Amino acid sequence: MNNYSNLALSKSKGRIFKEANSLYRTPFQRDRDRIIHSASFRRLKHKTQVFVNTEGDHFRTRITHSIEVAQIARSIAKHLGLNDDLAETLSLAHDLGHTPFGHAGEDALNECMVNFGGFDHNLQTLRIVMFLEHKYLKFKGLNLTLETLDGLLKHNGAIDDLSTVNRLIGLKSFKNKINFNNSGSLEAQISAISDDIAYNNHDIQDGIRAKMFNLNDLIEINFFKDIYKSHKNNIKNNNKDILIYQIIRDSIDLMVRDLIKNTKNNLKNNKVKSLKDVYNLDDPIVCFSSKFLKIEKEVRFFLRSKMYNNKKVLLKNNHGKKIINKLFYKIKNKPKKFLNDDQLKNDTNRAIADFISGMTDRYAINLNKGI
């Protein structure tokens, strides 16, 4: 086990608004706790991952997904000697900006906002933690550490288009405390790829539960076939539920093992000795080997063909899009009926997008019925 603690973001450079340090929690632990106690995090319980929240109690929602991502990210960061609190914090926060009805809802809201700056769920997460959560007297938002803000900004890698960040958040809001040119920290990269590991594997579990495909379909992928063969004779009465759980469990474990091994190789091959080296590299350091990149591609293709493009899912997505579209223009027609003066004092269209994106599936459905 190699220790890369010298590459960890172990100390914080502070926050946008100065605060006294806690006597018993690190700045990153405070960030995590602020996220967990936020209204936006609680609402993730009733937001779609793939299946609308009303479809069943056992399907994953945004909150269960975020917790699973955080668990994977924390384990990886801890093994590498990095800041596991920060990796966990970024993972818990990464989906705060998601709309109701998943990516379909985001697409619909972006279409509504196309002439008003657009909508992006990653940047909406920043809007939430910087402006929209109201819990403190001296500032809006959660006033998270600069390292957490930086990691959320770079969830998908280095920033390619600063104009979008400026349009949706405002570069001045960061008060020159963020370096927009750097690549993301190792903790940010770990959080991002843990997101991929979690949803690729857990969507398989949910897809089988929803009977969109079965175990025989899954083991057409050689990666899963090999795992299946290693377990099928050891499961009493060939219990399929346990067998599927063991397959997903081993899949996650194998992906994490490959990721850690390949990350160590990348650190060595790129002669990464300091945080500055991490920031200056254009390509991600935390990534799969070529073998597992191919496996990931196969898994994504499988899920897209069997699940995401399933007729039932597409119908639900289209219904969700219609709800978002209707809500946007109904609220736009009478904004004062739904939003207060403080929300409307700047950009009405952005305020409507903030309002709709913060809705749960259930709230959006019920509001649509009564509007």
Curated annotation (Swiss-Prot):
Family per record: Belongs to the dGTPase family. Type 2 subfamily.
SUPFAM superfamilies registered for this protein in UniProt: HD-domain/PDEase-like
UniProt entry keywords in alphabetical sequence: Hydrolase
Lineage per the UniProt record: Bacteria, Pseudomonadati, Pseudomonadota, Alphaproteobacteria, Candidatus Pelagibacterales
Any Pfam family matching the protein: HD
NCBIfam families: dGTP_triPase (TIGR01353), PRK01286.1-1 (NF002326)
SMART domains registered for this protein in UniProt: HDc
Gene Ontology MF term list: dGTPase activity
Single Gene Ontology BP annotation: dGTP catabolic process
Organism: Pelagibacter ubique (strain HTCC1062)
Protein name stated in the entry: Deoxyguanosinetriphosphate triphosphohydrolase-like protein
CDD domains: HDc
Residues in HD domain copies: 62-200
InterPro entries referenced in this protein's UniProt entry, alphabetically: dGTPase (IPR006261), dGTPase-like (IPR050135), dNTPase_2 (IPR023023), HD/PDEase_dom (IPR003607), HD_domain (IPR006674), PHydrolase_assoc_dom (IPR026875)
